[in-house]
């Protein structure tokens, strides 16, 4: 504008200020007009039959001789045009009145669809300005009345937040070099003004609610001026926002806006948590889909990987469908790779996700972890866990994951080979309180040493408990692992001394000791030097007439003279696997039988005694006598009435192996036989309250007690045990195993000549005491090998087989054993031997138990 030289600087300044005020008002009006038009356009359904604009530019109508002109050439220099443009001639106008010193004008706007705009940049509000608005585009020219046509354009000074708008074309994709691939996961950013920062995310902060697992763009600047496209959540700039353009995914319609808009504060969204007033299903952003979460595990930004792993842990919590889908989408490998991440919070979040994914009966995820070398990766993570609370939390998570993995048979040997030594040396030995010099260091600052580490110890012993039910090679490696048996026995001693006889840690420890005691008399080094010959002469078993009163009394007199326990002398304190069969460990087992109320602890304690008493070896003979001297026989017999059948079966197995000592057999017949008979059903019409396995165990124990014990056989007759056995032998819906066991027990009773006449007076016949023909003639594909079954007419009799059953996992399987399964009819006087593991289908008390599902952890 040309001004006379005579005018004062004050008048020039006043004129400039007036023009600036007018320009500001005009800018506000234009911004309001643009927003209104955009809102109308987004509500219009565009049809391809409408005629396009010929000139490719906008048309503005003129009123009162006040034109507003677009310059198409200038616009095209900054714009990406839509392919087709349509005008909806609805004669609708929106006018705005501007008042200044010179003239009042109205600006009519025609409703336009598919107009062209330039690529936008986010507007940053200047300090002290009145509000957040976008400046008028640079290609608008204003001419007012009384102003010379050569008046220079009033130009807004360049502002970092300067912005103009662009409507994306169909399937719009930015060609900027920093834009990620279209098929990749899209970042999600919260609304502005929330106070988050990059330092908060990189320090490992996880937001408090599940809505806070927003996924940030790793290429987005976190502060300051951005001279480029605005990265915002899909749908942030919609019909009501200041920017109609939004970033599109490959499956979205570029002309449809389904989400409301939340303007950003300045040019960027805050990376902080969600505002408390925001509903989870409101419009700012959507929850990421599972494939997107899995893709985010490989993002370059630490905060994205951290939130993705934590969110995946949340999604997989008690959700079997998500676990299967993660396995199908190959989500396990990126999680395992995150275990090597240099940042501890990311490692913890990834391990927590693996912990949840590996929980449950499904085996696919467990196998995927194994096949991706997840077990050695977890072992390495345990070794590099660090110190302090963070290190302890990571140790708990890693050991919990290993415990979950150990419930699958095909992973157990992998754990033995890759994680056994690490678990022992990193967790069990240093935190159990045991010292290699034999000292006791149970307390630190007034607490038992292992209390703070008890969760990690529980997980570790749970994992070892599961893998100890694997084959003999696993048991051998565990017995010979330096410090393992010593630490476990020390924990057992400490728990019993503190009265913690029902804790989960104690349960795992006792089950572990029971399992590694299985076949201990055969599998320890130099086992042959501990072997003994059978106590009873072989001639006793060949003739039924040998079961006489005089022979029984003779054995009793000979055994009463020797009722002492002579454990082998040792020059050095026992350590390692030698601790498994020492008198101290036997006393601990008996103490648990007397004081514990946990079925799993009772079962494991009785099973450990059963394993140690099996076989003809020096320590087996000494332990049978030690149990008697410690009053353990009566304590075991008291649990025959326990409500848990697993406990009853374990007690029966222990009593049967303890009957290898003739003095024990007499005492058990005197004090426990009535309880055994009471567990049998008293009516053939009434179905037994016990399962088939439990009934067979009870009958087999009765058989072992009355073998060579006339007084016990008489007591069985007086307690109506014969009636119950005959009912079972006659059938009445009983299984073949029950009928066969009852038949051989009755045959043993009829073998006592002293009892035949009283039995005949009671109305019994010889046929009532014979083994069922159907039971003996059929091929036995499934044989109860826990009892030495007696068939005196069978030649080539086999050795007796007494049960020695370690805890195993809950996967159902048949009862397996070594050797031939058919016609296993051994005698009572031969060697006490053992069987392979019995696999049960009970989850509550089995040897292999899953760890409880991990709660969402604050990482």
UniProtKB/Swiss-Prot annotation:
Can you tell me which residues the record assigns to a coiled coil?
A: 15-44
Q: Which domain of life is it from?
A: Eukaryota
One CC-aspect GO term: nucleus
Spans of repeat ARM: 279-317, 320-359, 363-401, 402-446, 464-503, 513-552, 574-614, 621-660, 661-700, 701-746
Q: Name one Pfam family in it.
A: Arm
Q: Where is the composition biased (Basic and acidic residues)?
A: 243-254
In which tissues is this gene expressed? Ubiquitously expressed.
Q: Where in the cell is it found?
A: Cell junction, Adherens junction; Cytoplasm; Nucleus; Cell membrane
Q: What keywords are assigned to this protein?
A: Cell adhesion, Cell junction, Cell membrane, Coiled coil, Cytoplasm, Developmental protein, Membrane, Nucleus, Repeat, Transcription, Transcription regulation, Wnt signaling pathway
Region Disordered: list its residue ranges: 226-254
User: Main location per UniProt?
Assistant: other
Q: Might you name a Gene Ontology BP term for this protein?
A: cranial skeletal system development
Give this protein's Gene Ontology molecular function annotations: cadherin binding
Q: InterPro entries from the xrefs?
A: ARM-like, ARM-type_fold, Armadillo, Plakophilin/d_Catenin
The keyword Repeat belongs to this UniProt entry's keyword annotation? yes
**Which SUPFAM superfamilies does UniProt cross-reference here?**
ARM repeat (SSF48371)
Which family does the UniProt entry place this protein in?
Belongs to the beta-catenin family.
Q: What does this protein do?
A: Key regulator of cell-cell adhesion that associates with and regulates the cell adhesion properties of both C-, E- and N-cadherins, being critical for their surface stability. Beside cell-cell adhesion, regulates gene transcription through several transcription factors including ZBTB33/Kaiso2 and GLIS2, and the activity of Rho family GTPases and downstream cytoskeletal dynamics. Implicated both in cell transformation by SRC and in ligand-induced receptor signaling through the EGF, PDGF, CSF-1 and ERBB2 receptors.
The subunit field of the Swiss-Prot or TrEMBL record says: Interacts with C-cadherin and with zbtb33.
Notes concerning its domains: ARM repeats 1 to 5 mediate interaction with cadherins.
The name this protein goes by in its record: Catenin delta-1
What species was this sequence derived from? Xenopus laevis (African clawed frog)
